[in-house]
Amino acid sequence: MRYLWLFLIHTIGLFATDKTLDIIKTIQKLPKIEVRYSIDNDANYALKLHEVLANDLKTSQHFDVSQNKDQGAINYAELKDKKVHLVALVSVAVENGNKISRLKLYDVDTGTLKKTFDYPIVSLDLYPFAAHNMAIVVNDYLKAPSIAWMKRLIVFSKYIGPGITNIALADYTMRYQKEIIKNNRLNIFPKWANAEQTEFYYTQYGERTPMILKYNIQKATHENIASSQGMAVVSSVSSDGSKILMSLAPDGQPDVYLYDTHKKTKTKITRYPGIDVSGVFLEDDKSMAFVSDRSGYPNIYMKKLGLKESAEQLLYEGRSNESIDAYKDSIVYVSRENLNEFGKTVFNLNLITLNSKYIRRLTVNGSNQMPRFSTDGRNIMYIKKTPQEYAMGLILLDYNQSFLFPLKNVKIQAFDW
């Protein structure tokens, strides 16, 4: 048994029906880790790594983190007196004339160096990903619940000017940002096409009709998927990438279509003389949830993947429920609520599951939009706006914790994680 707290995390997780684990903090102290950095070779770069790594470990909720400079030889006796369990030393090394980011992980209890992890410095601005990978190494050493989501890319559409949006990539903290599609057009609604994050779909408004394109990041190539008058948006991709759900409006009113990426065929799966949009896969890709105005206002419905299958209303609370995402049998959605004490309309995130009528509120103020599950369903990212801030939000469902990463000089139209 490495640490009792690890057992507690897994055990409580089995019985916590609403996935809140604040109780852990009162049961067992987290293992203490001291994050250090070396000033050799490139002190500024090492300091950046040190800052991101420390913040990643804090964000994970698995460590009690302290920070320090390199103290030379590891004084295990002194560290034991301080109740420190681990030391993570980040540095920049030079091998064969090339700089590399290096992590050394020391176990104070055993008095030994346990891990050495090298990450090539291909480009200086990629340092957040080096730090995220280091955090994953430290976390995996303790066999804590996975934080592999930290190394995933965010793809987003950013406003440039009237009628112009570019597609860019970022890390989850938004420290790293790089524009990859810039053509003075409206490029919107990006959606990852595969788990490897090598391709994504997006909508481009050209001279005539909106088009759904698939872009390969490595090859910088495009594939034309579909086009439609008025609306053409990919809203969900199946777990194996073989099928996608699209909102198209060839006859004026939008409906949800199922597209087979192998056969290159699309099938209409909703038929209603109103609005059916934003389909997201549910129940291991066997059904979908979607937004419809069948109730006279936007609400969440569910149906199997066939045109003749009936639709079932999932929510009977609220008068405007929209902007959804799903993971297995869980659905996160945006609910428009009454004006708050400041006269502002509030848009909050709520979480439901198909096997429970319980609605879990995830936010309490401001405008919270575009919720997106992580690939393991344990976390949600979203855009938060208040009079005081504009930020990318992160909710750790297992720990009932949230974080905000300020969005400076960037306005996001849509994103995927």
Curated annotation (Swiss-Prot):
This is Tol-Pal system protein TolB. Part of the Tol-Pal system, which plays a role in outer membrane invagination during cell division and is important for maintaining outer membrane integrity. PANTHER family: PROTEIN TOLB, PROTEIN TOLB HOMOLOG. HAMAP family: TolB. It is found in: Periplasm. One of its GO terms (cellular component) is periplasmic space. NCBIfam families: PRK04043.1. SUPFAM superfamilies: TolB, N-terminal domain (SSF52964), Tricorn protease N-terminal domain (SSF69304). The Tol-Pal system is composed of five core proteins: the inner membrane proteins TolA, TolQ and TolR, the periplasmic protein TolB and the outer membrane protein Pal. They form a network linking the inner and outer membranes and the peptidoglycan layer. Pfam families: PD40 (PF07676). The gene is tolB. Belongs to the TolB family. GO terms for biological process: cell division; protein import. Residues 1-16 form the signal peptide. It comes from the Bacteria. Its main location: periplasm. InterPro entries: 6-blade_b-propeller_TolB-like, PD40, Tol-Pal_TolB. Keywords: Cell cycle, Cell division, Periplasm, Signal.
